[in-house]
């Protein structure tokens, strides 16, 4: 029996309960693999944001914070582990919903759910460990003072997340924010909110204190903008486009509000001629750009090939690309599903046509797979004869499209790799480990992969440089995003300070 092609009907999740949006509006949810409407989500607006922020502020300060913000980290850890357990219990259902909502292969969505559960478990451990790090002493040069550090939650945080890994990207923010003791308003992308709303259902099941996590779905200008500019939101964490990130920075600057931004990328993958196994390098190249249909901020979308191996490498890359199963994402073995929406589909096609008009060669792909007449599907696409002035070299496509240039020397490869406004990630494949270490230091990126592309571990920091944003998610750095550091210094001497001449005694 085929799985159901519908989604649960949910409201906004505010104050631990479901609420219909104040204006009563809802947005259709379209399965991008079939173009069928499979349900709808609530369309929140500024009025709903106001209610959610009030719920979060109340949850932060309720009873002096003893139930959440000032509770022991071990208390919060119990809730995070309970969420992780429910994610595992509902893994198959959540993966299916995410596939229906986003068009990604079911295998990929299933793996994402494993990562979601692991992320909540990891930050549960860090929440517990935080208890032991409070009042860390500071060594001072004066014996009559003692000083220590407190780490405290920032407060109410707005979390605005993208559509490419809907629940996972939300979890990268929700889990550390809750571990820190913050209360939160999550605003997922309107293009893929279904699994995030199910997180609200899970929080109800486990008894998360009301208002600790609130979920507002809706359009960016109507819900995201009021959230990022709200005077009672203490921080905004955003993952998405560079242009939206700029607007959030401008809004936050009016209140000197901290933000962390994980934005776009145009990451390079450099392959040298000393590799022993071309197919091994080709597969990593494929994974770096065709996984999740290339809708990955860190996708290694610029391939730099040493001129001595370029032809042989491209021949194998085309052969491997032809072998990818592009299909309905629910089919077993699917490795390339649809892109997220009609708008994204048309945007990617425009990038490809512009590359062709500017003189590039579409070596493989570039259009709709002939066997798929419906849905927003694109072939894996390889573009050669690219110059650095072309749009396809400079701008983020966010689709299954890779552009290729050749190089002769290591210094030329590094120069080409750094020829971008972005700085999220970079990769190098070579058997010369000293060369790999040199290039790791030379690339202007926050993440470097050696002999691979795209591995991601919750224990390691994630974030970029330049127009790819600032701040780091994941690992202990992800927790620090949601903590403030407070210095406490005590004067311990029985003697007076003695700076001023005392008045005469009566």
Swiss-Prot record:
The record marks 164 as: Transition state stabilizer. GO terms for cellular component: peroxisome. Gene3D superfamilies: Aldehyde Dehydrogenase, Chain A, domain 1 (3.40.605.10), Aldehyde Dehydrogenase, Chain A, domain 2 (3.40.309.10). Keywords: Metal-binding, NAD, Oxidoreductase, Sodium. It is an enzyme of class 1 (oxidoreductase). Its EC number is 1.2.1.-, 1.2.1.47, 1.2.1.19, 1.2.1.54. The keyword Translocase does not apply. InterPro entries: Ald_DH/histidinol_DH (IPR016161), Ald_DH_C (IPR016163), Ald_DH_CS_CYS (IPR016160), Ald_DH_CS_GLU (IPR029510), Ald_DH_N (IPR016162), Aldehyde_DH_dom (IPR015590). The active site is at 262 (proton acceptor), 297 (nucleophile). It catalyses: 4-aminobutanal + NAD(+) + H2O = 4-aminobutanoate + NADH + 2 H(+); 3-aminopropanal + NAD(+) + H2O = beta-alanine + NADH + 2 H(+); 4-(trimethylamino)butanal + NAD(+) + H2O = 4-(trimethylamino)butanoate + NADH + 2 H(+); 4-guanidinobutanal + NAD(+) + H2O = 4-guanidinobutanoate + NADH + 2 H(+). NAD(+) binds at residues 161-163, 187-190, 241-244, 262, 396, 462. Na(+) binds at residues 101, 191. GO terms for molecular function: 3-aminopropanal dehydrogenase (NAD+) activity; 4-trimethylammoniobutyraldehyde dehydrogenase activity; aminobutyraldehyde dehydrogenase (NAD+) activity; betaine-aldehyde dehydrogenase (NAD+) activity; gamma-guanidinobutyraldehyde dehydrogenase (NAD+) activity; protein homodimerization activity; sodium ion binding. GO terms for biological process: cellular detoxification of aldehyde; cellular response to anoxia; glycine betaine biosynthetic process from choline. Pathway: Amine and polyamine biosynthesis; betaine biosynthesis via choline pathway; betaine from betaine aldehyde: step 1/1. Signal peptide: none annotated. The keyword Metal-binding applies. Dehydrogenase that catalyzes the oxidation of several aminoaldehydes. Metabolizes and detoxifies aldehyde products of polyamine degradation to non-toxic amino acids. Catalyzes the oxidation of 4-aminobutanal and 3-aminopropanal to 4-aminobutanoate and beta-alanine, respectively. Catalyzes the oxidation of 4-(trimethylamino)butanal and 4-guanidinobutanal to 4-trimethylammoniobutanoate and 4-guanidinobutanoate, respectively. Belongs to the aldehyde dehydrogenase family. This is Aminoaldehyde dehydrogenase 2. It comes from Zea mays (Maize). The gene is AMADH2.
